[in-house]
């Protein structure tokens, strides 16, 4: 992200980054221990809850750090990608919380299914999906060795807004799955999310028209998208 924003953070100021990395990994270990052993000893759910809380908090802290860096950096065409990263970082705490809820011992099956679907929507479509799509905004033309097409940044920001809205609607619809119309709302949320993806796809196709991918890496990325 520093390269994208063209900023240089001195080594003496990297204490926060190191703390986040070590604490995040510790939280992941605690979370895994809780998930593995709480079935035999339900009281160990506290480890699952603590681990999920730490993971969510560290990633959110990373999002705040990125937000501060954006405010300090000069305007850049790569700024759109950082916006995607910030949005994704702020989604993970909610995904982690929903994941912790699904692991609660004795949770009723219907609630478990609803929380699980919401957890998957936030983490897969939100945290992972938004991060990957944001990377492609700038990485795709780089792989093709060409420039970003006109209006790509503006379109990508609107696509991000739609993707966030789609994730939010889908997750809330899953949580309140017993409410009449929730399934329709969840489908509508997915549709909105897909519209955001299609907007990014249009950017990718327009970029590809300036220079067609002739090597395996860009072809595989395009096929994967």
Q: Whereabouts are the PLM-identified features?
A:
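Hydrophobic alpha-helical transmembrane segments of multi-pass integral membrane proteins
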Residues: 1-225
């Amino acid at each position: 992200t520093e390269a994208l924003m063209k900023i240089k953070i001195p080594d003496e100021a990297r204490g926060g980054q190191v703390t986040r990395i070590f604490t995040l990994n510790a939280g992941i270990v605690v979370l895994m221990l809780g998930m593995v052993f709480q079935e035999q000893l339900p009281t160990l759910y506290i480890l699952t809850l603590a681990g999920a809380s730490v993971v969510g908090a560290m990633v959110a802290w990373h999002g705040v750090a990125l937000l501060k860096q954006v405010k300090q950096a000069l305007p850049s065409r790569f700024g759109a990608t950082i916006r995607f990263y910030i949005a994704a970082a702020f989604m993970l705490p909610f995904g982690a919380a929903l994941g912790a809820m699904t692991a609660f011992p004795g949770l009723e099956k219907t609630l478990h299914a609803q929380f699980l679907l919401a957890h998957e929507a936030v983490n897969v479509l939100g945290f992972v999906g938004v991060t990957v799509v944001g990377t492609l905004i700038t990485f795709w033309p780089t792989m093709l060795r060409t420039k970003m097409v006109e209006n790509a940044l503006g379109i990508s920001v609107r696509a991000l807004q739609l993707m966030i809205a789609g994730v939010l609607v889908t997750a809330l619809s899953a949580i309140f799955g017993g409410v009449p119309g929730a399934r329709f709302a969840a489908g509508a949320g997915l549709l909105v999310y897909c519209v955001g993806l299609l907007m990014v796809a249009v950017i990718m196709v327009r970029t590809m028209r300036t220079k067609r991918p002739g090597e395996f890496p860009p072809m595989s990325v395009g096929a994967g998208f």
